Regions:
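N-terminal assembly/interaction segments in proteins that build large macromolecular machines
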Residues: 2-269
Length: 269
């Protein structure tokens, strides 16, 4: 059996980020072979992942960014189990490394993002590696992207909230774009305008509105009218262009964009 030196343990720790005792044990099992020791650590990570599969990963980092030309934007959610890990500098750095790959490679979906290379390893495998290092279940649970003439991103302090927005003209004022993306982060609209709301959602809102009106003793025909009135309220609360602007509730976001465009309307895409 090979002698495991402290310098070897430190070297493996620097290579992998794993704990000192984990590295020593891995090198012992691998008889001093660094490549095999890395595999041992990876296998440990896989075991941790399986062991913790029934535990939720509800904390984490929600982050977004854009390419340097502001033509593309991406948003990801990397979950962990505890707030302690979510605030860990290495965890946040790892999340940003995944985001940077998403921006550079522009994958079609989450599955494709997970298959991309990060430091010579597929992102999905690197997540497994990090599970072994960190000791918590990690999950890349969400990925979204936007491509447009001008894309802006926003990350709320603490990495718990983020948003991206695309505009169909490149000459939009940066402050206007920032205001809109912060509106999205704050008010969480389900669509850009009324016409973008799925019919299934509209039908559900009308049905709920009618049921509420009937429970209040309204006749069927009156309940229908009341439901449509409530639907208009739903549009104002849930569609971006019809929401009240959080910085000036006398304006909707649509009106704010029109006023800012000086006759040349800028639309969110």
């Amino acid at each position: 059996m090979a002698e495991i030196k402290a310098a070897d343990v430190a070297k493996l720790r620097n290579m992998t980020g794993a704990g000192m005792m984990d590295c020593k044990q891995a090198l012992t099992e691998a008889n001093g072979d660094f490549e095999l020791a890395v595999d041992v650590l990876r296998k440990k990570g896989q075991k941790v992942a399986n062991k913790r599969a029934d535990r939720s990963a509800t904390e984490g980092a929600v982050i977004s960014g854009t390419t340097k030309d502001n033509k593309n934007g991406s948003l990801i959610v990397l979950n962990c189990e505890t707030d302690f890990v979510a605030k860990n500098e290495d965890f946040v750095k790892f999340a940003h490394s995944i985001l940077n790959i998403a921006l550079a490679k522009n994958p079609a979906n989450l599955e494709e993002l997970l298959s991309l290379d990060l430091n010579g390893t597929k992102i999905s495998d690197e997540i497994t590696n990090q599970i072994g290092v960190i000791g918590e279940k990690l999950d890349l649970s969400y990925f979204e992207k936007v491509s447009a003439e001008y894309v802006v991103s926003y990350i709320h302090p603490g990495n718990k909230l983020a948003a991206i927005a695309g505009f169909n003209q490149a000459n939009i004022a940066p402050q206007v774009a920032k205001d809109v993306v912060m509106q999205i982060a704050a008010m969480n609209p389900i669509s850009i305008d009324k016409g973008d709301v799925p019919q299934s959602v509209i039908d559900k809102e009308i049905e709920i509105g009618k049921d509420l009106a009937i429970q209040e003793g309204k006749a069927e025909d009156m309940a229908e009218k009341i439901a449509l009135g409530r639907l208009n309220k739903f549009y104002k609360e849930s569609t971006l262009l019809n929401q009240q602007f959080v910085k000036d509730n006398k304006l909707t976001i649509g009106e704010y964009l029109n006023n800012s465009a000086k006759g040349d309307r800028k639309s969110v895409v």
